[in-house]
């Protein structure tokens, strides 16, 4: 059965459920997912970097690849930059180059984890000189954001300690607040600071921004334009991420997402590949917040993945599509029935209401949306048939690989 016939069957079913199909399609067309520049370049683990033929080696090449994802999905028009990985001499020119590809430059991510000086921390380092270096880098990123037209500084710190007694918890907290206050004061309106947390790695005893409560505390101390960024891979196993999302929405402090998936830790697997039901439940809370007039939501939806074994552009297309699927399913939830079941204390019916939406095959719906947008209905198939991969392999070649360990 072709997608058109499958869509007719699905549309009839959804109409019978009382779904406003035009509204759902409109929401899907308006969905936006930002992709990361670093997701198009070679990456790996501390054990090995497996290089890929044709992988992007310059910022311009990363943007070229991101434009392919936008070309075949239609909802990924912005690209996050990582500084200094994406540092260039002329950001006005980079912005114009991106615009020429149909893209905009998105969140600016300071790198506060690779310099040798940051062994004991960056913004929390006990040495004031090194803290100054880290703060100055963040201030540089604010200037870069101004030049690129970005209104987001996305901040993740690797800062923490590995052993008891290594440093003062309260001393590091105070140093971090002092640094963040200087950064926040330098950010012009409406630029936002998104504070990302992670419960461990690379620090193993404690992490200075280890959980959502800590990130929220700092955001509340700074001001309304400081918010929390939720990375799906940055939680202990079993964490109820959708509850965290709901609480942050209710406090008007959910600033952004880094979509990815995990089996054990910060695995950076393709979003939706391991636990698609969790992703659906997260989108359920996001839609619930969007429908609440008492909540002011301005959420940056971003992917944060390093594709070590999958082809990078295909993996990114797959990731965007998986976000579309989760969002589409969540849009189909009968919210009136859900609320009635909750009020009646009917736990089974409440859960079944969610499952009815989750179990719906929304691929024909997404095919119809893409057709309306003038896109191919099968993004990965269309990309594979385009010849782009073969073209960049011939033009770019393959970089040399490396190991995470010396002399290996």
List the model feature ranges, each with a label.
Residues 31-50, 111-125, 157-163:
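N-terminal small/glycine-rich loop or linker at the start of catalytic domains
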Residues 1-39, 49-50, 165, 178-184, ...:
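Histidine-acidic metal/acid-base catalytic patches
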Residues 38-40, 82-86, 110-115, 158-160, ...:
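Active-site beta-loop-alpha junctions enriched in small/polar residues
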Residues 50-54, 77-93, 163-164:
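Glycine-rich, proline-tolerant flexible connector loops at the mouths of alpha/beta enzymes
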Residues 35, 66, 98, 134, ...:
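Conserved, mostly hydrophobic/aromatic
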Residues 13, 17-27, 104-105, 117-223, ...:
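Active-site acidic/histidine proton-transfer and metal-coordination neighborhood
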Residues 24-30, 60-75, 87-110, 142-149, ...:
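Acidic (Asp/Glu)-rich catalytic clusters
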């Amino acid at each position: 059965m072709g997608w058109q016939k499958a869509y007719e069957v699905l549309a009839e079913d959804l109409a019978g459920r009382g779904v406003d199909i035009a509204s759902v399609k409109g929401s899907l067309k308006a969905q936006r997912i930002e992709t990361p520049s670093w997701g198009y370049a070679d990456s790996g683990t501390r054990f090995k970097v497996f290089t890929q033929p044709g992988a992007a080696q310059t910022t311009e090449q990363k943007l070229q690849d991101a434009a392919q994802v936008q070309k075949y999905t239609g909802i990924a028009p912005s690209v996050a930059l990582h500084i200094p990985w994406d540092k260039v001499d002329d950001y006005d020119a980079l912005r114009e180059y991106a615009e020429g590809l149909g893209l905009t430059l998105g969140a600016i991510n300071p790198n506060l984890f690779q310099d040798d000086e940051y062994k004991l921390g960056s913004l929390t380092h006990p040495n004031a000189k090194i803290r100054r270096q880290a703060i100055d880098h963040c201030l540089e990123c604010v200037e870069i954001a101004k030049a690129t037209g970005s209104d987001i500084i996305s901040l993740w710190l690797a800062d923490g300690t590995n052993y008891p007694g290594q440093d003062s918890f309260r001393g590091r907290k105070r140093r971090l607040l002092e640094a963040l206050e200087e950064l926040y004061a330098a950010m012009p309106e409406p630029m936002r600071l998104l504070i990302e947390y992670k419960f461990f790695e690379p620090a193993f005893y404690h992490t200075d921004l280890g959980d959502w409560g800590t990130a929220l505390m700092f955001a509340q101390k700074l001001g309304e334009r400081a918010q929390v960024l939720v990375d799906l891979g940055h939680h202990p196993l079993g964490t109820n991420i959708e509850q965290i999302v709901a609480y942050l929405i209710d406090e008007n402090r959910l600033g952004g997402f880094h979509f990815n998936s995990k089996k054990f830790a910060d695995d950076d697997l393709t979003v939706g590949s391991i636990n698609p039901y969790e992703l659906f439940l997260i989108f359920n809370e996001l839609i619930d917040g969007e429908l609440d007039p008492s909540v002011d939501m301005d959420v940056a939806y971003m992917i944060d993945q390093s594709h070590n074994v999958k082809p990078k552009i295909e993996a990114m297309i797959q990731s965007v599509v998986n976000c579309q699927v989760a969002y589409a399913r969540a849009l189909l939830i009968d919210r009136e029935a859900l609320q009635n079941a909750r009020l009646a204390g009917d736990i089974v019916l409440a859960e079944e209401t969610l499952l009815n939406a989750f179990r719906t095959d929304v691929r024909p719906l997404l095919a119809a949306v893409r057709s309306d947008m003038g896109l191919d209905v099968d993004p990965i198939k269309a990309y594979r048939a385009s010849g782009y991969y073969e073209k960049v392999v011939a033009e770019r070649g393959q970089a040399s690989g490396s190991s995470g360990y010396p002399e290996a």
